[in-house]
């Protein structure tokens, strides 16, 4: 199972493209999600991610997340996600491999020590917020993969291993344009696995997928495990 922003959007987590919050609408995603953006204005980047952290904490997993967790009770299912929220975990999925990091993990930008201290309260979005400071003097940053950074080794290794051994790869809610994650479906197809795309929109994967289901995750995933054999035949 490879999930992307679409499944979280159903729970109320806006994507960069859909985020209409007035404070952030005028910024290019690169300014808020890159190593360069952090160097230029860490207060702005911290404010953006702190707001996202609290936004995600206030929403709930949807039927798509719950269906994936239920699949793990009946089949050997690996959950790989490009999302930085914890909705898969709150729905009951274990383990979940986060390719792009997590809004709920933090580390020092200088020494990389994990940060488990308190976070500033945020009742309303604020354009700039001062990040906490590590004991070494470095600023605390979200443990997110930004533009210009490599994917974390362990989640990526698990994702490749799961893809190489999979009979079926379900790709849900992803645009299929962000690499290297988008290459997992290509890897599965090259090894003879079936690739099932769940997305209400056509993507670059649609033409090569074994099966494309034009529904949202919450519409398609409940009951899909039982229907897959017939659909693929």
From Swiss-Prot:
Principal subcellular localization: cytoplasm
Name by which UniProt lists this protein: NAD-dependent protein deacylase 2
Family stated for the protein in its record: Belongs to the sirtuin family. Class III subfamily.
Gene symbol of the encoding locus: cobB2
Cofactor: Zn(2+)
Sites where the protein binds NAD(+): 4-24, 82-85, 173-175, 199-201, 217
Main function: NAD-dependent lysine deacetylase and desuccinylase that specifically removes acetyl and succinyl groups on target proteins. Modulates the activities of several proteins which are inactive in their acylated form.
Domain notes: 2 residues (Tyr-49 and Arg-52) present in a large hydrophobic pocket are probably involved in substrate specificity. They are important for desuccinylation activity, but dispensable for deacetylation activity.
Annotated positions binding substrate: 49, 52
């Amino acid at each position: 199972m490879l999930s992307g922003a679409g499944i979280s959007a159903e729970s109320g987590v806006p994507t960069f493209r859909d985020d209409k919050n007035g404070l952030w609408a005028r910024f290019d995603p690169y300014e808020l999600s890159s190593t360069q953006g952090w160097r230029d204005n860490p207060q702005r980047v911290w404010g953006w991610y702190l707001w996202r952290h609290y936004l995600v904490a206030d929403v709930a997993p949807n039927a798509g997340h719950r269906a994936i967790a239920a699949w793990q009770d009946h089949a050997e299912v690996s959950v790989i996600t490009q999302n930085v929220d914890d909705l898969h975990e709150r729905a009951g999925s274990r383990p979940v491999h986060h390719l792009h990091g997590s809004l709920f993990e933090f580390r020092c930008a200088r020494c990389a020590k994990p940060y488990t201290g308190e976070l500033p309260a945020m009742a309303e979005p604020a354009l700039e917020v001062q990040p906490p400071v590590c004991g070494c003097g470095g600023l605390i940053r979200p443990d997110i993969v930004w533009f210009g950074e490599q994917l974390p080794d362990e989640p990526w290794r698990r994702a490749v291993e799961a893809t190489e051994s999979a009979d079926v790869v379900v790709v849900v809610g992803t645009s299929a344009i962000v690499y290297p994650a988008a290459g997992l479906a290509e890897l599965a197809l090259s090894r003879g696995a079936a690739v099932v795309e769940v997305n209400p929109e056509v993507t670059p994967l649609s033409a090569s997928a074994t099966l494309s289901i034009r529904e949202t995750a919450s519409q398609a995933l409940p009951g899909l495990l039982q229907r897959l054999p017939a659909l693929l035949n």
